[in-house]
Amino acid sequence: MTAIADRPVPASGAPAVTPGLPHVDLLRLRDRLEPAERARLDAIEDHLQTRVRPHLTRYWDAEEFAFDLLPGLAELGLGRLVLDGSSSLFQQLVHAEIARVDLSLSALVGIHNELNLGMIAGLGSERQKATWQGRLESFDALGAFCLTEPDHGSDIAGGLATTATRDGDEWVIRGAKRWIGAGTIADVALVWARDTADGEIKGFVVPTDTPGYEATKISGKMGLRIMQNADITLDVRLPADAILPGATTFAATRALLRDSRMWVGWQGVGAQMGVLDVLRSYALRRQQFSRPLAAFQLIQAQIAEVAGNLAASAGMMLQVDTLRQEGRMEMMHAAMAKATSTRLARSSAALARDALGGNGLLTEHEIAKIMGDVEAIYSYEGSYGMNTLIVGRALTGVSAFV
């Protein structure tokens, strides 16, 4: 079978970047970077726009993972972004640039860095690091973060049902996980299970070739179709040292989960950058009544609203990232930023879909793809509703959780 990236690119694909017009980084956040990081970001953007983006709609339509694009991402250092010593703003702008071309790819790189590699490097044993860190950094191995369960999503901290039982010099892990990104293609899974001895939620490193690990692809999704989400069943025996030594209580993971929630806010920024790319390009190329769509006031109003949503999201994310660097970011900030950015991304995608008319329903014009993908980021890493409850509790001192 011919790799998707080797197949011809359809002529109908719109150019992402419109030369001579303002960059979709409307607030010029990249100007805050040091020159070396700015040059690196420009190189990453160029690779994503010219070597990656033209192929992604076909992967999305086919519900296939883009394995043949990983070597190029590894060459750019995206497999070890969280460990390379770059500035926080640079890392977040990279996440936005990846989301600008595709949210599945962004989810893979983000979860890979923020959760899988980040947790093994930060919470793992020396043996676990030696076994997995190098392979993950080069994308020679992929990881899966196994927390959500079939019956427990928003209530996972209190309701997690997967169990870990110590049996001599082994751990026995039994349970089920759902919606696990890369679950069918990962080489290693970080599995969260409740210790039957003390009731604490603990992390375990589980090679996916371990007998009793079974992953089934979730098909028919309306969004994140490139990401291979999976149902996972576990009935495995692991050596005693499979436990993550820095993750023997769920509290140990909260800071990483908080930071990953903020990262999803940057996905919302990137998605809106992609929306503006496609909407502006289409409005300039598409002719109606012998004029480009961009010459009509209603279309310009939609473009301006998308731009405002994007700028508002980017400005919020910049300040929240600043608070994080200063050690002052609280869960309220991460929840508010994630909820707001993804809500505005949803609105921006809908505005662009309307402007494209019937063509907006076709994935070849990309907006339909972005709309579906945005629905996923609106819901994962804390649904919109749950994040608003976190913010409301922080602002009023009253919990509305039931």
Name these PLM-found stretches.
Residues 28-35, 214-311, 377, 393, ...:
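Glycine-rich beta->alpha junctions and the first turn(s) of the following alpha-helix
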Residues 136-139, 269, 273-276, 303-313, ...:
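Alpha-helical transition-metal enzyme core signature, strongest for iron centers
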Residues 144-165:
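A gly/ser-rich beta-alpha-beta helix-loop segment of oxidoreductase catalytic cores
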